[in-house]
């Protein structure tokens, strides 16, 4: 079964957007994954196609109605084991581990909120998993949904050129990725570290592991504190050859 993402949104014209180019776009055109963007307004029942109303208890903005959104969700032929997600800054942070789980499944149903948010009752009644891509607020969930989908698509079989491309990246073993270099050998007086040109695979692996650990300690102490030490060490010892990697 082809991995498929179904997006419920007020702006289906935003899709595929950036998902239609580069790795994700080529894979989409090749049938390695599928994408469906559905307009939430199609589930509205009044002549104005209303989808929102004022917040109960007062306050600014508008809230997406539970009845309309529930109808939109129910109109999707979703398998019982298909994840139902809603992009929300109050959700659990999206991690590479969760991305891998989603990529290994049938593909998610993703609800994109707008306005002041979504009526909590539909989140509870339809078992929506709230997911956040960071501690900031966007105008809607569409861009966040694209980020989640792109992260998943890269892990699907046949999408990446080399299996090692995804296993060496940031977060794959609890570390940020080590620095990458390519030609020219010297750029504005800055040379490629000699160890990367040595041909000694063991030294290259040790250097990369050391750089990844140093970057993680400095920039993401939370990741460093939670890292699986044995897994990281094994990863460093198993790395073989230098490589170049692009997503474009």
From Swiss-Prot:
Protein's UniProt keywords contain S-adenosyl-L-methionine: yes
Pfam families: tRNA_m1G_MT
Signal peptide range: none
Binding site for S-adenosyl-L-methionine: 113, 133-138
GO biological process terms on file: tRNA N1-guanine methylation
Catalytic activity: guanosine(37) in tRNA + S-adenosyl-L-methionine = N(1)-methylguanosine(37) in tRNA + S-adenosyl-L-homocysteine + H(+)
Any one GO molecular-function label of the UniProt entry: tRNA (guanine(37)-N1)-methyltransferase activity
Gene3D superfamilies cross-referenced by the UniProt entry: 3.40.1280.10, tRNA(m1g37)methyltransferase, domain 2
GO CC field: cytosol
UniProt family annotation: Belongs to the RNA methyltransferase TrmD family.
Name under which the protein is recorded: tRNA (guanine-N(1)-)-methyltransferase
Native species: Rhodopseudomonas palustris (strain TIE-1)
Lineage: Bacteria, Pseudomonadati, Pseudomonadota, Alphaproteobacteria, Hyphomicrobiales
Gene name per UniProt: trmD
């Amino acid at each position: 079964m082809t991995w498929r993402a179904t997006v419920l949104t007020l702006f289906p014209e935003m899709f595929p957007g950036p998902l239609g180019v580069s790795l994700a776009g080529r894979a989409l055109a090749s049938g390695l994954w599928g994408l469906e963007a559905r307009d939430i307004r199609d589930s509205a029942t009044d002549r104005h196609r209303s989808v929102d109303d004022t917040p109960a208890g007062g306050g600014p903005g508008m809230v997406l109605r539970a009845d309309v959104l529930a109808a939109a969700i129910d109109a999707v032929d979703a398998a019982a084991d298909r994840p139902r997600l809603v992009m929300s800054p109050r959700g659990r942070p999206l991690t590479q581990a969760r991305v891998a789980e989603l990529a290994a499944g049938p593909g998610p149903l993703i609800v994109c909120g707008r306005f002041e948010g979504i009526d909590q009752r539909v989140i509870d009644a339809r078992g929506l998993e709230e997911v956040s891509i960071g501690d900031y607020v966007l105008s809607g969930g569409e861009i966040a949904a694209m980020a989640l989908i792109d992260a998943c698509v890269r892990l699907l079989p046949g999408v990446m050129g080399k299996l090692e491309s995804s296993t060496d990246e940031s977060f794959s073993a609890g570390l940020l990725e080590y620095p990458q270099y390519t030609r020219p050998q010297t750029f504005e007086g800055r040379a490629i570290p000699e160890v990367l040109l040595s041909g000694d695979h063991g030294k290259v692996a040790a250097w990369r592991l050391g750089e990844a650990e140093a970057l993680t300690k400095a920039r993401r102490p939370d990741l460093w504190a939670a890292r699986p030490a044995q897994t990281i060490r094994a990863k460093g010892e198993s790395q073989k050859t230098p490589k170049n990697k692009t997503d474009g």
